[in-house]
Amino acid sequence: IEHTAGASFAPNPIYFDPENIVKLAIEGGCNAVASTFGILGSVARKYAHKIPFVVKLNHNELLSYPNSFDQVLFGTVKEAWNMGAVAVGATIYFGSEQSRRQLVEIAEAFEYAHELGMATILWCYLRNNDFKKGAIDYHSAADLTGQADRLGVTIKADIVKQKLPTNNGGFKAIGFGKVDERMYTELATDHPIDLCRYQVANGYMGRVGLINSGGESHGTSDLRDAVITAVVNKRAGGMGLISGRKAFQKPMNKGVE
């Protein structure tokens, strides 16, 4: 939803058909397939017993103008449970004006999901225009994303999804929050694995699993980029990665690879 159907599927229109998304996940050996109520609901009767379904509860609908950093619920936990999903996912835009409301909504949804025996996955993303300073984008800073992960596990997410960190020192550069210099000198270095390990530490030292984003497709480097993300994540103590546009914005056989 956040990337819009046209922009997402124009490179490979077969994925306008939800069944092909599920087939890609199955043939690619994925542990689960995460998508919308509409996509998974349209094929649930045929596929919910063949691969675990993760239904995304909320989205940025991206058709309001001007667009805002917000997430709206598209359905309920009970709907996801009724279609045979084993887990629900949700996004909170930490740092945005609406993040407090999103926290309350998703905490309540996750509580009910656990009552039904479902797992919960939280997309712990940052969204604030002031998180960019000059040429540096601190939306992927280890200290900021680590704290977002910490908030996510506090509302009992079983898995957190986060961007792979590319820098550090967001709190200091932006000039807010609380810091201890040892966050930057002892708990992390500039090495990508150490930056990711700081994210893992904020997930109760790995008690809550960390998966990193696959990111947008860059063409011929996609496989290499995915391997790097997976290796960094696993060596840092994470649980892997989630692939989307890197997989379905190319022919099925290449996506499976």
Q: Where do the language-model regions lie?
A:
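PDZ domains - specifically the beta-sandwich core and the conserved carboxylate-binding loop
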Residues: 213-215
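Alpha/beta enzyme core
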Residues: 3-211, 220-239, 243
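C-terminal helical cap(s) of enzyme catalytic domains, especially alpha/beta-barrels
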Residues: 236-237, 247-257
